[in-house]
Design a protein with these regions (language model features):
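Helix-loop junctions at membrane interfaces in 12-TM secondary transporters
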Residues: 20, 101-114, 314-327
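Cytoplasmic helix-loop-helix junction between adjacent transmembrane helices
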Residues: 114-149
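Symmetry-related core transmembrane helices of the 12-TM Major Facilitator Superfamily/SLC fold
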Residues: 172-189, 389-407
Length: 455
């Protein structure tokens, strides 16, 4: 991870180098904290005697907080302009509330601890992303490279923690507390903005900004902002793909620990599987902006949902080799969705709405989709067993993907009859290649001219 930090910071000027390293370690700190908490939670709940339905309810507390509480933190962050201070306070509160899990192992005690913890922890990701993405733009650091630090940190923690928790499972929440304090330190070390910038321009890193301009947000001229945050109604389909994909990914992630224990394996295997999935993200991060430019955001999102079906089927087989193969698909089931959606949201959000834009994405992905995954997954798991539940979830994801693809094509057809042709990436589901690149160049030229006139 240190070598990656140096690579991120290799820019002219000491301030830029220091800023790149600070952004890198802030991302590492968050994903290390998430890696110590999320993957092992269902295993811990199983070890203290919770049923699948009870686990589903407990795991739903975090999505509920994402839906109802996290947007309030994002709005406070944007309204005050003090994103770093808000994120620091949330990190400190997360560290303190993690220790509430030691109050008892009854269902009520665990439920209370979970509710209090997620009130703060659920807001860390969108606020951290907003700060890091804006910092990457301000200091000309590639966001994909910074995000690789988070992947490495997550993989390192889940592997080490998985082995450690085999011997001392009760230590999980002490580790979460310590890593939340590390997150606090990394936030305090984040650089300030070097100058006032347009919030939309500050949303992307230099490389991501060049390629994500192919993401459509100008297909509907003179249309009121969607949710008062986004420039185009196309955001509905971006969020729909994120929902469908996360519905499968959320089920798999939430109940993988229980499934592994049910199959007779230990927490060590949970750590190994989580590390494998995290490390598989690295190749995608190296080429993510090129993939978006080549195939388009919608193509990648549709492809990711199809691969999510394959991942669920492989894990559902219950064999270690197939489970490892399924986890290797993390790169094309999570990271492609995360990168496409995060960059799209960052570019299409109106000025001053960056935190709220990322908040909407997290609300749909980590909130609504996770609630469906956890509640339905817990009920199906108790009724049919975890193996069959994986297969049933794969079928639901496949149907959802088909519905969103058809709806998007219908919407595009309507737009094409009333507006100028959409930019290249919006054609992702029906074509790519030279024609797409030509359309992208034309739309990019038009967009640059419009922005120049606006200035």
């Amino acid at each position: 991870m240190l070598s990656q930090a140096r690579a991120v910071g290799e820019r002219p000027g000491g301030g830029r180098s220091k800023a790149g390293a600070s952004l890198f370690f802030a991302n590492v700190a968050y994903w290390m904290c998430a890696g110590a908490y999320t993957p092992f939670l269902s295993s811990y709940f199983t070890s203290i005697g919770m049923t699948a339905a009870q686990i589903g309810v407990l795991l739903t507390m975090s999505p509920l907080a994402v839906v109802f509480i996290q947007p309030l933190w994002a709005r406070l962050s944007d309204a005050t302009g003090k994103r770093r201070l808000v994120l620091a306070l949330l990190s400190l509160a997360s560290a303190a509330s993690a220790l509430l899990y030691y109050l008892g192992t009854s269902y009520t005690a665990v439920l209370v601890a979970t509710i209090v913890f997620v009130l703060f922890f659920s807001a860390l990701l969108p606020l951290c992303d907003a700060l890091v993405i804006q910092g990457c733009s301000d200091y000309e650091v590639e966001f994909a490279h910074v995000r690789m630090g988070g992947t490495c940190g997550y993989a390192f923690v889940v592997f080490i923690v998985g082995m450690f928790l085999e011997r001392l499972p009760q230590a999980q929440f002490v580790l979460v507390c310590a890593l939340s304090l590390l997150m606090l330190l990394s936030v305090l070390l984040l650089p300030g903005s070097p100058g006032r910038k347009d919030a939309c321009a500050a949303a992307l890193s230099s490389a991501a900004a060049q390629d994500s301009s192919s993401l459509v947000h100008d297909a509907q001229p003179n249309v009121k902002p969607t949710f008062g945050i986004f420039r185009s109604q196309e955001i509905f389909f971006i969020l729909a793909f994120a929902f469908v994909s996360q519905m499968g990914l959320g089920f798999s992630g939430s109940f993988l620990g229980r499934y592994v224990v049910e199959l007779g394996y230990s927490q060590g295997l949970v750590g190994v599987l989580s590390a494998v999935s995290a490390l598989s993200e690295l190749p995608i991060l190296l080429f993510s902006h090129a993939l978006v430019a080549r195939f388009g955001a919608m193509s990648l999102l549709g492809f990711s949902c199809i691969m999510m079906v394959a991942r669920l089927l492989l894990i559902g087989m219950g064999l270690v080799p197939t489970m490892v193969a399924g986890q290797l698909l993390q790169s094309v089931t999570y990271m492609t969705v995360y990168y496409c959606c995060t960059c799209y949201v960052a570019e299409s959000a109106l000025p001053g709405k960056l935190s709220q834009g990322q908040s909407v994405f997290v609300l749909v992905q980590s909130g609504l989709a996770m609630m469906v995954a956890n509640l339905a997954g817990g009920a199906i798991g108790d009724a049919f067993g975890m193996r069959l539940s994986y297969f049933l979830t794969a079928g639901l994801v496949l149907m959802g993907t088909f519905v969103v693809m058809v709806a998007y094509q219908v919407w595009r057809s309507g737009i094409s009859r009333t507006c100028a042709p959409a930019s290249a990436s919006s054609r992702g589901l029906i074509g790519s290649g030279q024609a797409v690149r030509q359309d992208h160049q034309a739309s990019e030229s038009t967009e640059k001219g419009g922005r120049h006139g606006a200035r």
